[in-house]
């Protein structure tokens, strides 16, 4: 005679209060920019594992995207696995099935699945367009290191979240989540999601200073960086928009102005044939002591 033992277990996780609005948001877009050590990716991983383990969200499936598919293994996949083991401890394998090839995670309670893809070329983008699930529907997408993606990549992903959810679990909703360090102030993500108000968008900001789990040594390290590398600290310490590395001209502002040569006191062209990038020609105007 075989006997089965019933396990009563309640998963537990610790969250940073700063991310409560993020985890409660039901709009279409959650856009999380933040400093290194802010805990944004850890929070998103735990939020997804908590929701996908909950019978209240039966039918929810998640697609996780990095620009390069292979980088998921040591980043998003590892982060989600870590969240499972934090929340379920020694019972993790009783509640979640882990598949290493291809990468996937499946909750044994709800049947909800997590799969991982990349969008580095047209072939991978086409694969994303044909994703289906045996149970439920693709309703959530997580783009980690989202600044690696082109706007066209995200548009393809966004198009995957469509169709009425009538007849399915009423708790389900479509949502794209992006997490990233805001490297460039000219990035398309800033223009699309941060520079104008949109009721479908939650644009969230966090830093290591709001992470209650950060250790004192890391905090001191970031304070040293503030003195030694102010621009790097702005991006990786404060989570502000900026530019890092490779810039020749760093002190400039972006404005609209007339490019007619007659509008300047002097005008010059310069050419850079480029070792790493394509040939470039730069027009420089001089007017009243200002360079354009």
Region spans (language model):
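Pre-P-loop entry segment of helicase/translocase ATPase cores
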Residues: 1-29
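Inter-Walker segment of RecA-like/P-loop motor cores
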Residues: 71-139
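Walker B catalytic acidic pair
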Residues: 144-145
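ATPase catalytic-site recognition across NTP-hydrolyzing enzymes
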Residues: 211-273
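ASCE P-loop NTPase helicase motor core
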Residues: 148-226
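Walker A/P-loop NTP-binding motif
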Residues: 41-58
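Nucleic-acid-processing active sites and adjacent nucleic-acid-binding tracks
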Residues: 283-292
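Conserved RecA-like ASCE P-loop NTPase motor core of nucleic-acid helicases/translocases
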Residues: 60-72
